[in-house]
């Protein structure tokens, strides 16, 4: 059995660069921007909540104001008697979307491992764009307002959007091996934050013309992106005659970044028994089953942890612009632009923390330290003054310590789990494992969005932040066995290196 840190060469970022071709760059950019566009359309909904709430409630509350007749002509858009009920319904729509999104993730992961990933991704992007157009633009143009219709459209939108993440992570996992995966996926997982920034920017630019145009712009761009993905995305190196990732590129070494989660220390003795099919082989690897994927080491613990963390991350995603407008009285367009700083912090956090995890060759300790700081940053942001510069700084710090770990779990760690030794003979496990992790996270986020609106309405925003602190602490609790295990391995490797010297 090999001694950790001695005879086996550790994966390095230099090896990653040396194997990178222009196909890798194109795949990186296409998957990056395809998911950015999906997130931009989601962000649009959160950015126009104030405008939608105003449209759905009476504008004149003075009892002396005369009533316009006929009622169905002048007041058909007044779905709710006051802004509080409209806000609660918007929270319900968020919950509906996330529940259907979570269910769709479990299904999309399985479908993505059995069908062409390019077809599934492009279909989801184009179809979701049409649903967003119907929801926000066509209904307003036709002056058609119906709560049940909105709910049905958002269920369908959640199912269609769920095709995105498992597919793009699987494609990235097919092209990029374990060497430098923390850094590459940390940088690449900024796609969600870039999408949030893009959605906020597009919405703020056209919101003065009406919220329906914000939906129109993002839906049009997303549909065009789906067409480009269908025409240009390569889902695997074998499509252009390049060899697929081999065992050495996957870094199946004992000092591997997730080795404590992936199997026993002597698993590398059987390393030669695993291989990825050659480019000229016609046989397809058998896709892993759903329950088999759930039983893989680390999948359940990271899924539960991500359920708590995604609840917090998506609460900022859905409610931050509304919170800034509601709590500080800032204009909606200003709140949209200021909320970008949370995503900027998430981009920087995901990249830096991914790089650190590559250097340490461990993921869980990096997550634990970041989440401990996240608790403090949440407490600090809950007491942020009515000052835009100070609010933006604390918001970026909060995004760094919450968005960073969230990006790492949903991308690099999911790819690690989907390509561990136990599934080395089945390269069709990536989308399934990613769907399980992200699907479980979305269930937690779905429950959280309704709880946020409920807590805010009854107890106020301060208790919402206390709830976030509790969820961030629960994330640490779920991954604590993995943290202890990886720290022990780090200390063991350090002792061996000292003895070798």
From Swiss-Prot:
Q: Which GO terms describe its molecular function?
A: transmembrane transporter activity
Annotated membrane topology: Multi-pass membrane protein
Q: Where are the transmembrane segments?
A: 20-40, 87-107, 119-139, 153-173, 183-203, 214-234, 298-320, 340-360, 364-384, 393-413, 435-455, 459-479
Q: Could you tell me where this protein is found in the cell? A: Endoplasmic reticulum membrane; Lysosome membrane
Q: Name one GO cellular component term.
A: lysosomal membrane
Which branch of life, at top level?
A: Eukaryota
Q: List the disulfide bonds.
A: none
Q: Which Pfam families does the entry mention?
A: MFS_1
InterPro entries assigned: MFS, MFS_dom, MFS_trans_sf, Sugar_P_transporter
Where are the glycosylation sites?
Answer: 62, 273
Q: List UniProt keywords, sorted A-Z.
A: Endoplasmic reticulum, Glycoprotein, Lysosome, Membrane, Sugar transport, Transmembrane, Transmembrane helix, Transport
- Cross-referenced PROSITE patterns, in alphabetical order? MFS
Q: What does this protein do?
A: Unlike the other SLC37 members, seems to lack glucose-6-phosphate antiporter activity.
Q: Which family does it belong to?
A: Belongs to the major facilitator superfamily. Organophosphate:Pi antiporter (OPA) (TC 2.A.1.4) family.
Q: What is this protein called?
A: Sugar phosphate exchanger 3
Native organism: Gallus gallus
